[in-house]
Curated annotation (Swiss-Prot):
Membrane topology note: Peripheral membrane protein
GO biological process, one term: intracellular protein transmembrane transport
Gene3D superfamilies linked: Helical scaffold and wing domains of SecA, P-loop containing nucleotide triphosphate hydrolases, SecA, preprotein cross-linking domain
Cellular component GO terms, alphabetical: cell envelope Sec protein transport complex; cytosol; plasma membrane
Disulfide bridges in this chain: none
Protein name per Swiss-Prot or TrEMBL: Protein translocase subunit SecA 2
Catalytic activity, as annotated: ATP + H2O + cellular proteinSide 1 = ADP + phosphate + cellular proteinSide 2
Length: 763
């Protein structure tokens, strides 16, 4: 394997973190296993604690051996050498590339246990509550074997239940719930009210989904102060506008532009002289643009569904309903108005944090995914994380057929149906990956017209996903699914109990069909990875048309000539190379979006750290009382009869109230600046530089204003033996709060999000 050292270095592996060293340690672990198996449980657990007595493993090979023996005794699962290698790489802080079905759950639990034995608090981060609870219960015997505690966080838990879970050595939780708890803990006024304690390590499952696909998704904590819903009149007027007459849409359907005729129609209907007057640019024009985006670009059953009278967003990277997500308030309200639903108020944002900033809070981060190699650049650039490739336990027997490329989408769709029907006729199970709800349902209807029974897994029925996926490998099954990333359940050949395994193997295993290329090869490979699990046979095949989104977007401004046959099929390596080029272009666009958006978010994230540090000092010391009593000595002197502890808490409540309020107002201001910042390009100002200039200036004002406001309140508010009567002074904190995730780019993959594209209305 030494010949592959160059490959490891290309992936960012540091010297010493290479295949050769890892495999040598795993071989040593195998030798240790024979000696250690004679120990009883108590002595084996004691040996593990001895190995990490000073907080670092004295002998990594022996620690791997102990963990492997314990896994076998408690779970009946003996790790393969490649799994032990993955455990080692996680413990040393890498992201491991492990194929689907290679046992990531066990690997993560062994690594968490090994790190827990070193005295570290470990958060094992999943993508949803179901997997967090499932994995915690499944792996509990292994963790507890060594006297460590394990807990799980889920959405329905009370603060006390969360507090108890976070006290554990190993905590399983979804990335959103852990993030929301961070935000809620930033509103406490007494340290004892915090639910979390500082964690040392994050082990992230589906690391590329969390660290790349959703890195810039903001988690939001909001309070019950009404926001501003867009005016209904604008929605009604925009609804009457006609495409190509009143507005035009860009070729990639990512941006919409008002024509002069459209602007005139709006001005007449709204009774204003010009949309572009100063009084309307930051208000009416922004609302018009949001309504236009909602009307022309956001499509029901592709970007969202309507269920139970509510707009529910579809997570583009997973093809399921994003229960906790909403768009920025103006856009959310615009879509609700478009669908004739009750417009929800967004409330006042109290605090927010992106997943990328959340992950940055952990001193050590590692993770697992089946498609880490494709995300190497992003992982190294944004997180300084290195990728370690773990070989399969059994050789890959999946056959990846060359793409079948068609001239038109109609010809492609016809060929897809014919291929599925052909495979189904043989009895071979077929898993079809589509891009959105509408496509999955149209394809399923077409197959049912051919009397083919179809199971559909999409955002409308994701509650059934575990059952549908488990059955997808049985004889004659046809399963149509939106994105397969992070589904968390393996497709087993022969059905859930593998009773028809031999017959399905004889038929060639699971056949995976992609109805189009994704915007990144990584998502294609996530779908491919469902076939050929643990050495099983399998087939993967992608269909592409020259009208597909990835080709149109990635090939914009360029062209390719090709001669299709009578069915529309283009059998040309040159065209296949062209399609791959188009995909690379869209991948580059996504990386640029990430880079640009992070530049906007980074400064706020840095400012947030300063706020966190200030908050911690106010919570944990008497700083608030010292500052206020010094600034308002006469008031402090008049409170000498009040108990010192009460005074310190009263000062703390006052200081924290105004710090939190000013931070919330700063976030709202910077959100407004961000929405209109691209208008500054018209004035030949650099938007990013101007945004940073405003953010720095306003943050300096925030710091001083928070203290000045607190001093003024301290001078006037009633303070007695019960503390500061802030509510009586009209300074109550929100009586209700709620959390959600903001889908900042509903047209994910475009060069402009709805928000960053406000200026585009000027054409």
């Amino acid at each position: 394997m030494a010949g592959f050292d160059w490959f490891w270095k290309a992936l960012g592996g540091k010297q010493g973190r290479n295949q050769k060293r890892s495999l040598a340690i795993v071989d040593q672990a195998e030798a240790h296993t024979r000696d250690l198996e004679a120990l009883d449980d108590a002595h084996l657990a004691a040996r593990a604690r001895t190995l990490v007595g000073d907080g670092t493993p004295q002998d990594p090979a022996e620690l791997l051996a102990v963990l492997g023996i314990a896994a076998h005794r408690t779970l009946g699962m003996r790790p393969f050498p490649v799994q032990s290698q993955a455990v080692l790489r996680l413990i040393e802080g890498d992201v491991v590339h492990m194929a689907t079905g290679e046992g990531k759950t066990l690997v993560g639990a062994m690594a968490a246990t090994g790190l827990g034995l070193q005295g570290k608090t470990v958060h094992s981060i999943t993508i949803n509550d179901y997997l967090a609870v499932r994995d915690a219960e499944w792996m509990r015997p292994l963790v507890e074997f060594f006297g460590l505690s394990v807990g799980a966080i889920s959405e329905t838990m009370t603060p006390e239940q969360r507090r108890e879970a976070y006290r554990c050595d190993v905590v399983y939780g979804s990335v959103s719930e852990i993030g929301f708890d961070v935000l809620r803990d930033q509103l406490i006024t007494r340290r004892a009210d915090a639910v979390q304690r500082r964690a040392d390590v994050a082990i992230i499952d589906e690391a590329d989904s969390v660290l790349v696909d959703e890195a810039l998704v903001p988690l939001v904590l909001a309070g019950n102060q009404p926001g501003h819903a867009p005016r209904g009149k604008i929605t009604e007027v925009v609804r009457r506008l006609k495409e190509n007459d009143h507005y035009t849409v860009s070729e990639d359907r990512r941006n919409v532009f008002l024509t002069d005729k459209g602007a005139a129609a709006l001005e007449q209907a709204l009774g204003i002289t010009s949309l572009y007057d100063d009084e309307h640019v930051g208000t009416t024009l922004v609302q018009v643009n949001l309504a236009l985006h909602a009307q022309a670009l956001l499509i029901r059953d592709i970007h969202y569904i309507v269920r139970d009278g509510k707009v529910q967003l579809i997570d583009a990277s997973r093809g399921r309903v994003a229960d906790l997500q909403r768009w920025p308030d103006g856009l959310q309200a615009a879509v609700e108005a478009k669908e004739g639903l009750a417009v929800t108020e967004g409330g006042r944002i109290l605090d927010t944090i992106t997943l990328q900033a959340l992950v940055g809070r952990y001193p050590m981060v590692c993770g697992m995914t089946g498609t880490a190699v494709e995300a190497t650049d992003q992982l190294r650039t944004f997180y300084n994380l290195h990728v370690s490739v773990i070989e399969r336990n059994n050789p890959l027997r999946r056959f990846d057929e060359a793409d079948r490329i068609y001239a038109t989408m109609a010809e492609k769709n016809r060929a897809i149906i014919e291929e599925i029907a052909h495979l189904h006729h043989t009895g071979q199970p077929v898993l079809v990956g589509t891009h959105d709800v509408a496509e999955s349902e149209e394809l399923a209807d077409a197959l049912r017209d051919l009397d083919i029974e179809v199971s559909v897994l999409n955002a409308k029925n994701d509650a059934e996903e575990a059952r549908i996926i488990a059955e997808a490998g049985d004889i004659g099954r046809v399963t149509v699914s939106t994105q397969m990333a992070g589904r968390g359940t393996d497709v087993r050949l022969g059905g859930p109990d593998e009773s028809h395994y031999d017959q399905v193997v004889e038929l060639g295993g699971l056949a995976v069909i992609g109805t189009a290329r994704h915007r990144t090869a990584r998502l294609d490979n996530q779908l491919r990875g469902r076939a050929g699990r643990q050495g099983d046979p399998g087939l993967s095949l992608f269909f592409v048309s020259l009208e597909d989104d990835v080709v149109v977007t990635g090939g914009a401004g360029e062209s390719v000539t090709a001669q299709p046959d009578a069915t529309g099929l283009i059998d040309s390596n040159r065209v296949r190379d062209w399609v791959a080029h188009c995909q690379r272009v869209t991948e580059g666009q996504l990386l640029e979006i990430h880079s640009q958006t992070w530049k906007y978010n980074k400064l706020l994230a840095d400012q947030r750290v300063i706020i966190d540090e200030r908050r911690a000092r106010l919570l944990d010391t008497d700083l608030a009382w010292r500052e206020l009593s010094e600034r308002a000595q006469d008031r402090a002197a008049g409170l000498e009869g009040v108990d010192r502890e009460v005074l310190e808490q009263a000062a703390r409540d006052i200081m924290l109230y105004h710090l939190d309020l000013n931070w919330s107002e700063h976030l709202a201001l910077m959100d407004d600046v961000r929405e209109s910042i691209h208008l500054r390009a018209i004035a030949r100002e650099t938007p990013l530089d101007e945004y940073h200039r405003i953010a720095v200036r306003e943050f300096k004002t925030l710091a001083q204003q928070a203290v000045d406001d607190a001093v003024e309140t301290f001078r006037t508010v009633v303070i007695d033996d019960r503390g500061a009567h802030l509510e009586d002074a009209g300074l109550a904190r929100p009586s209700a709060t709620w959390t959600y995730m903001v889908s900042d780019n509903p047209l994910a993959g475009s060069g402009n999000s709805v928000i960053s594209g406000i200026g585009n209305i000027f054409r």
